Amino acid sequence: MISRNRRRNTQQKDAEKEKQTENVEEKEIKEAKEQVKDEKQVITEENVDSPKDVKEQSNTVNLQKNDLVKEVINIQNQTLNTIVAENKVEIEEVVKKYIPSYSTDKLIVKNYRNSRIKCQTYNKLFRLLHVKSYLYDVNGEKKLSTRWYWKLLKDDLPAGDYSVRQFFLSLYLNVLDEMPDYVMLRDMAVDNPYSAEAGKIVDEKSKEILVEIYQDQMTEGYIRRYMSDLRHRISGETNTAKYPAILHPVDEELNKYFLEHQLIQPLTTRNIAELIPTQLYHDPNYVFNIDAAFLTNSRFVPPYLTQDRIGLHDGFESIWDAKTHADYVSARRFVPDLTELVDAEKQMKEMLQCKLNHNSWQELVHGRNEAFKFIIGTVLSTRTIAVEFITSNYMSLASCMYLMTIMPSEIFLRESLVAMQLAVINTLIYPALGLAQMHYQAGEIRRLELAEMQVANRPIRQWLHHCNTLQFGRQVTEGVTHLRFTNDIMTGRIVNLFSTMLVALSSQPFATYPLDYKRSVQRALQLLSNRTAQIADLTRLIVYNYTTLSACIVMNMHLVGTLTVERIQATALTSLIMLISNKTVIPEPSSLFSYFSSNINFLTNYNEQIDNVVAEIMAAYRLDLYQQKMLMLVTRFVSRLYIFDAPKIPPDQMYRLRNRLRNIPVERRRADVFRIIMNNRDLIEKTSERICQGVLLSYSPMPLTYVEDVGLTNVVNDTNGFQIINIEEIEKTGDYSAITNALLRDTPIILKGAIPYVTNSSVIDVLSKIDTTVFASIVKDRDISKLKPIKFTINSDSSEYYLVHNNKWTPTTTTAVYKARSQQFNIQHSVSMLESNLFFVVYNDLFKYIKTTTVLPINAVSYDGARIMQET
């Protein structure tokens, strides 16, 4: 027997390791046998005259031998357990590596809660630019007249190969991150400290600019008087207020656009009532009251419930698996627990009379809630399911028959379904009818179809036909596709067919079974058929809880096979069927809206992130950064959905996701913001201290220019007298003759195009293709790869060297940077009046204003008007 077990074990993964173990074990057993034999001989020789002692010694030795055999078997089992454990670890590692949904349930629930999107507003205006002054003159003395200029607020363009296009893309993304859903100027307005009439100005930054300008010693009197006249204007008739704001033209255009395109809508009790799903609103078991009274200035941001535009169920197996698993974990929290069940001890006594061989009594006693939550949760989340059972346990197989009665085959894992169907056919149906065993054929899944053709008994054949043709219905409710059980299952009438089949099956001869075993099987089937009324009530209870919770699903339901499955023990199904009572349980009202809210928040966040990444793809494409940015864009999009681990998604699915996102049109607000930024690109470039508008090249050395605010520098602010050639046009055409000809004529030229001050690519890509004989002297004088502006800083606060003002030495250069003049700040031209509603209140969580109670006792199922369970 031991050797047979060993031959089986050699089929395991670590065959060589087991072989070594076997050799050691055989050697130990052989030595033990020889030792026992020697002991027997010694005992016989020494105790010839005492046969009783010899017998006792022999029994002792036999016991020792049996203990040794048991020890060897234990070692063998431990080896098997180790191998199985190692296999489990390997499988677990594979799942961790390739399935992004591998995480704890608590973490999934937490991430689901984090997906909530709050209405985005701000207490200050959006600004790309701010005001800056140059306080020192060229000779190091403080200026008597201060000049103020508009400068870029987030001027963080790094040196090197970083393109100005990438800078504008990051600038655009920054605008998208801060783009508000609504704006209320009244909340951000502050007092104007210099107002003659206690007026207000729009925000703190505008106030800071006022203070700096007012405190400037050289600010003229008419400017101070103008600042004292700045105040807000209120119109009570229209409930609007106008506030003065000090803004750059680009910021003014953006903020006015945000004010005109707010997402908020007026809020009334009707809006809240419309948020309640129609099915719940008309459910006789729930009473909804909206006690809050909302004023005319109440506002809310409607949820963004556009249906899945990517199609996660089609071609994204890893992502779909992660989403459905998260949905399953979330849905189970809201399925109610069964209460007032039948006494388990009494039921088990009846079942023990059937000589049932249950794998786990613990599962039998405590599995009813697990099975109840499992059935409802898997359909709500459209998860693939698998049933674990023991073929010899006919009570579990009968419970599986009930599961096949109410659950279509499309939701089962194919392998699990085939195994379950074969077990039911070969253990119950065919032996009852005296038919030969059905054998499995590779790839053949039509087990019950074949059985239907061979079975002549009408009730059994009707049940088989029902299982073969059972499918979920698809019902569109308020634009959302939901899975629906058939009418027979919803009303519980299908249990009559199930019960009739059980009675017909139990009355069959079971000719091939021994008499005791036959009676046990028939007793088990009769035990189930005697609970027909309770099973019918259970079916109605399952369907009612499912349909009630499914009304809270706001995303189309698609029944697609998942990579991982949810498993249930058949003994848990038996526990549910045998211990269910006539006590009705329905979802708690508070949990109902919590489930509804979590689904709304996820879909809203999902749509917002789609719009963001689509806008980013559009911007990257328009800025010629499409190829560089795609993988990063898609990865960031997936990670922002909270329930996915982006690095674990296979590359083919990421590329497919990229292609789907690329075909989605850009949302209007995001497209308009990009248009505003691109239309004002030149203005933004001029305000940056890190971006220049081109490079000046000369064959002969040129003296450095004198700039009032900077000093001697190789930065040129004026293009007069220079030939201008566009860098991008040269790169597109590939014709560099214009540059060569100009340099040969010793005519200074400007290669115009936005580049960083410090660069080693944008200019070099062009200059490296020019005739080296013409350009050699320029390269010799200055390293173009490290082109920087030469600024001789003359500053009394600086520890750098000083340049004597009357020094006759004039520095020269053959390269210079072309930088357009920054826009000078003029307060009278920079003040704009922004208008918004004077006062309104935005409500975020609308469901807290709905008071929901349940009717006791529970009235009826909303489908057919009959009671869910026949309570006594």
Curated annotation (Swiss-Prot):
Ranges of Basic residues composition bias in the record: 1-10
| Chain spans, region Disordered | 1-57
InterPro entries in UniProt = Rotavirus_VP2 (IPR007779)
Q: Which GO terms describe its cellular component?
A: T=2 icosahedral viral capsid; viral inner capsid; viral nucleocapsid
Spans through the membrane: none
Q: Where in the cell is it found?
A: Virion
Biased segments, Basic and acidic residues type:
11-56
Entry annotated with the keyword Ion transport: no
What UniProt keywords apply to this chain's record, in alphabetical order? Capsid protein, Inner capsid protein, RNA-binding, T=2 icosahedral capsid protein, Virion
Output one GO MF annotation.
RNA binding
**Main location class:** virion
Task: Give the superkingdom in one word.
Answer: Viruses
Question: What's its job?
Answer: Inner capsid protein that self-assembles to form an icosahedral capsid with a T=2 symmetry, which consists of 120 copies of VP2, with channels at each of its five-fold vertices. This capsid constitutes the innermost concentric layer of the viral mature particle. It encapsidates the polymerase VP1, the capping enzyme VP3 and the genomic dsRNA, thereby defining the core.
Known partners and oligomeric status: Homodecamer; each decamer is made up of two conformers of VP2, called VP2A and VP2B. Interacts with a VP1-VP3 complex. Interacts with the intermediate capsid protein VP6. Interacts with NSP5. Interacts (via N-terminus) with NSP2.
Q: Please state which protein family the record places this protein in.
A: Belongs to the rotavirus VP2 family.
Q: What is this protein called?
A: Inner capsid protein VP2
Q: What organism is listed for this UniProt entry?
A: Rotavirus C (strain RVC/Pig/United States/Cowden/1980) (RV-C)
Lineage of producing organism: Viruses, Riboviria, Orthornavirae, Duplornaviricota, Resentoviricetes
